A protein has these predicted regions:
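Active-site gating loops and adjacent loop-to-helix segments of metal-dependent hydrolytic enzymes
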Residues: 19-46, 86-108, 248-256
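Divalent metal-dependent hydrolysis catalytic cores, especially in the metallo-beta-lactamase
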Residues: 1-11, 19-32, 71-78
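H/E-rich (His + Asp/Glu) clusters that bind or coordinate divalent metals
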Residues: 150-154, 160-289
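Histidine/acidic residue-rich metal-binding segments in metalloenzymes
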Residues: 49-75, 82-191, 205-223
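Short conserved micro-motifs at the rims of enzyme active sites and ligand-binding pockets
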Residues: 13-15, 36, 84-86, 92, ...
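Short, surface-exposed amphipathic charged segments that create phosphate/polyanion-binding patches used
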Residues: 16-20, 40-42, 208-212, 289
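Short, basic, glycine/proline-bearing loop/turn elements
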Residues: 39-48, 192-199
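An acidic- and aromatic-residue-enriched active-site/binding cleft used to recognize and process polar
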Residues: 2-7, 78, 138-140, 174-175, ...
Length: 289
């Protein structure tokens, strides 16, 4: 699952990076990744027009990643801006692109409009290519993370739009603190959640309450995930994956035992739900064994 945010920010990002120390850390990484994507299509700078950027850079990058086995594209955009994506026309975005391509310090309002268009374009292309869209959706690292900006309800207009009904959106990390809002959004046919990171930092007893709330209504929309990442010398990916996996299984046991005790489900149904969360739901979504 490659990161794709870099293609949403094709211009000079120094103004955005100056907003706070968190973004000062992230944007140079995005710029480096974008340079590698440009190099892969034998370019050093973005094309002169939006049409050129889409047809020479964005779509070929997505198609190449899909052909190499990617089942989804990941956005960490929550670290870079909020989920308040407007719906500009291609013509509006093209004018902004032409106005600022190759120039320093693009107007922030103009640049946001272009980002909004590019995010939607990439999401639609992912649907065409049968790749899911992964969105970081949990209060994240750093002290400047905008919690209000990642309210998943901000994305509801996109989830409802006919253009994106073929795009499967996976809200990563369970959406904390918006666990109830995200649970309600699971009624959308194109919205899922996974348990990565949340399973690492939230104790099983607390996680079990949220799991039960989701599983009682949308058991086929909840996906096992660990966020097995090398966080530090003391917490490598191995430890992170083990701890998160253990926590999920403990939380799942608590949630399903409670549902059994309250006669909401049978033992066979509990086993089926557990298999779904731990394997089958993700296998069906991503088309993997």
């Amino acid at each position: 699952v490659p990161y794709i945010d870099a293609l949403v920010f094709p211009f000079d990002n120094s103004g955005l990076a100056a907003a706070n120390p968190d973004r000062a850390l992230f944007f140079p990484l995005e710029d480096k990744l974008r340079a590698s994507y440009l190099a892969a299509v034998k370019l050093q700078t973005p094309p002169a027009t939006l049409d050129g950027y889409l047809t020479q850079v964005v779509t070929p990058t997505l198609e190449r990643q899909h052909s190499e086995g990617a089942v989804a594209e990941k956005f960490e955009i929550a670290y870079l801006r909020g989920f308040d994506f407007s719906d500009p026309s291609r013509e509006e975005a093209a004018k902004v692109y032409a106005r600022w391509v190759g120039k320093a310090h693009p107007d922030l309002a103009d640049y946001k409009l272009l980002q909004d268009f590019l995010f939607r374009y990439i999401a639609a292309e992912c649907g065409r290519l049968h790749m899911a869209v992964h969105l970081h959706g949990m209060s994240g690292a750093g002290s400047y993370f905008s919690i209000a900006g990642v309210n998943p309800l901000l994305l509801e207009p996109m989830f409802n739009a006919k253009r994106f009904r073929q795009t499967q959106f996976v809200m990563l990390h369970g959406g904390w603190p918006y666990v109830h809002e995200l649970g309600a959004l699971l009624q959308k046919p194109n919205v899922y959640l996974d348990l990565s990171q949340q399973s690492l930092v939230i104790p099983p007893r607390t996680l079990a309450g949220w799991l039960r709330e989701w599983l009682e209504v949308f058991p086929d929309k909840v996906l096992f995930a660990t966020d097995g990442y090398p966080f530090s010398d003391a917490l490598g990916w191995e430890e992170a994956a083990y701890l998160a996996s253990r926590n999920i299984r403990d939380a799942l046991g608590i949630a399903l035992s409670g549902m059994l005790r309250d006669r909401e489900i049978t033992r066979d149904r509990a086993a089926a739900i557990a298999r779904g969360v731990l394997h089958d739901n993700a296998a069906k979504l991503y088309g993997i064994p």
